[in-house]
Amino acid sequence: MNAHPSRNAPPQRWLILFSVCLAGLIMPLSFTGPAVALTAIAKDLGGGLVALSWVTNAFMLTFGCSLMLAGALADRFGRKRVFICGLAALALSALLMSAAQDIMSFDAIRALQGISAAAALAGGTASLAQVFNGPERSKAFSLLGTTFGIGLAFGPLLAGTLTQLFGWRALFLCLALLSAIALFSGQRDMPESRDPAASRLDWPGAIVFTLALSLLTYAVLLAPDSGWSSAQVIRPLTGALLFMLAFILIERRTARPMLDLSLFRYPRFVGVQLLAAAPAYSYVVLLVLLPLRFIGIEGYGTVETGMMMLTLSAPMLALPLLTGAFAHRFSAGAVSSLGLLICAAGLAWLAHYAPGQSLARLLLPMLTIGCGISLPWGLMDGLAVSVVPRERAGMATGIFSTVRVAGEGIALAIVGALLALLVGRHLAPPTANAAGAHALAMGDMPRATALLNADAARLKHAYELAFQNLLYLLALTTLASAVIIFLFLHPPARETPSSAPRITDAP
């Protein structure tokens, strides 16, 4: 570890951190905001269940599929260049969405927004790895994690307030303004950097991987409506498998691959990727499902929903920073596993809540989940760039962010499909049908009532039972993840405490 982390570091590095953190704030706002404003968007732009689901899915699909390519582009052509281009496209896409007149064009622009966000995130985080070293790097990435937490915490509240006061279009005008500020600051303060060993870009690998992940995500997103055994789902799944096999062959034969497959021989690298996926099913899915439940099933307003969601994400405001401050005393595996165990306990606790009970029965479990996930949250971004040489920071960021975001998109689709399946099982035939169960899972009570020909009380009861079962399954999955991640990230027995890798270690 560098004993003098500030030596040879650019003096404006904290201004660079401000630019990247502001860009990092835009990502969760772009993800959580439209979920709260979805009802208002639907009233204004129209669209069926499938088109409305793509308000979230289009962003997640393109964001996740573009991150690894964006990281490779950052290493090859310049991290600042990719960061600035991403922010410019983010500002433009937000302005276009604020002026959208129909749901199809809105969804298409959301896809562009996802690609733009991938470029900004990959370029920004790779730049941070170049200007910060040692303990300062750990602190910088903890601040970035806290910024993500602020966006997650206040995104629903901001979206609900803006939507109620000025309409949903104001949310995207706000995102455009934030993007412009980050763009100006980054252009002024960030130095250019690139991988000196990078030659030509691994275009075959980049294209094949993007196609594989796109087809996989697309298939999972179609499954709730078409069914897992339908040709519409089987065909893209088969294509994804074939493209992924081709990607592995390409990367093995490429001198400078986009993804160095040899890294997967190292347990800590694998552990970091598993950790990247863990929040998807323990926390992120709740950011979409809970607003749909509160607004569509329980009848809360957008501002009330934003206030309640603040309880889930408020711990992100402080705990990631505290985790970074004490990072040198504990192993990453121990801290991350402890957080996931707490999160699993909160999910099981939340499963006992039923509408009509005191708000404390709802908010305390949500607070517990938020506290638990905050512990690994402040470590993940720093860990991602600490397991590879600094010159491959863009690749590391791309891999980690791809696993994280693609995992979130796939988890959202699978969990949504699972909730619809559970709802259907709690509705006795002939009432139950797939379209009605999906509408109820999406929180669309009027449409579900019409499709299922049942009274609202019965539908709410079926939804509550299904949601309870879902939370138990998520708790069990999170518990298993805590154990597995501990085994991969915890120092082996042969290492002494002084030689064991710590959270702040960096090459």
PLM features: residue spans?
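Alpha-helical transmembrane segments and their membrane-interface exit regions
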Residues: 181-184, 240-246
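Alpha-helical transmembrane bundle and helix-membrane interface signal
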Residues: 133-134, 192-197, 221-234
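Central mid-sequence intracellular linker of multi-pass
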Residues: 178-214, 263-265, 424, 428-443
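Helix-loop junctions on the cytosolic side of multi-pass membrane transporters
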Residues: 184-203, 226, 249-258, 487-497
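A membrane-interface helix-boundary motif in multi-pass transporters
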Residues: 164-174, 222-232, 301, 421-475
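12-transmembrane solute porter fold
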Residues: 14-29, 34-38, 49, 55, ...
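Transmembrane-helix exit segments and adjacent C-terminal regions of multi-pass membrane proteins
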Residues: 2-16, 20, 24, 382, ...
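Transmembrane-helix bundle of Major Facilitator Superfamily
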Residues: 2-188, 351
